[in-house]
Amino acid sequence: RVEQSFEDIHKVWRYNSQGIFAVLEFVKKTGAKLVYAGSSTKFGDNGTGLNASPYAWTKSSNTQLVKNYGAWFNIDYAITYFYNVYGKNEISEGKYATLIALFSEKIKNKKTLTVVSPGTQKRNFTYIDDIVNGIILVGKKGKGDGYGIGSKESYTILEIAKMFNGKIEMLPERNGNRMTAELVTGKTEALGWKSRHNIKEYITELIS
C-alpha cells in the first residue's frame, strides 16, 4: 500500500519484487499463463506517480519485468491494473485499513472521519465483483499489457467522506499521495468488460 510502503519498505521489496520473481520463474517452468495484478499508481499524476512511493515503484517495475520475461522466455501473460477496490470483507482497522471500510467502521462507532489534505485527490472506486469479472475475462482473452479495470466515475476523497454524512477532520498531507490517475480501460472494455456497480449506492446501503 502506498503510504505504508515508506515505513514497511522491506516488506514491499520482499512481497512485490522477490515475490514476482518467484512467480515468473514458476510460470517459465510450467508454461502457465500469468495474469499480473498491476497498480493504477503507475498512471498517477500524468505518469510521475510511478516513482512517488516504494509501493508504486515496485509495482511499476514488476510490469516491466513481466514484459521482459515475455520477450526473453516467451511466457504467456496479461497485465491488469486495479483502481481503488472496495467491497465486502475489507480491512477496517489498523494502518492497512482501506478507505471505505475505515469510514464505515468510524461511522458505526460515531467517530470523526479523517481525510488527508488536500482532500481533492480523485479516485476511481471499483467494486470487487467488477474487478474479479475483469480478471477472469483478461485471463481468458487478454494478451500483453494495458488492461485497466476501473470505474469511469471518479470522486475526491472529501466527496466520499461527505457521502457518509459524518463529522470530518482534515489531516496533513502525506508522502506518495497522488492527486489523480489516468483511467486506461479501453483494452479491457474491448473484451466486453464494464463496471456495473456504483460507489454512491454502495455507501448509501452501508449507512442505511
What spans do the regions from the language model cover?
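N-terminal Rossmann-like NAD(P)+-binding domain of SDR-like oxidoreductases, especially those catalyzing
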Residues: 1-85
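Residue-level signal for the nucleotide or nucleotide-sugar donor/cofactor binding architecture
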Residues: 7, 15-18, 52-53, 57, ...
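Structural element of the ATP-grasp superfamily
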Residues: 23, 66, 103, 187-189
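Short beta-loop-alpha junction of Rossmann-like oxidoreductase domains
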Residues: 46, 88-91, 158, 187
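NAD(P)-dependent short-chain dehydrogenase/reductase
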Residues: 54-56, 67-123, 128-139, 162-165
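C-terminal substrate-binding subdomain of Rossmann-fold SDR/epimerase-dehydratase oxidoreductases
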Residues: 107-208
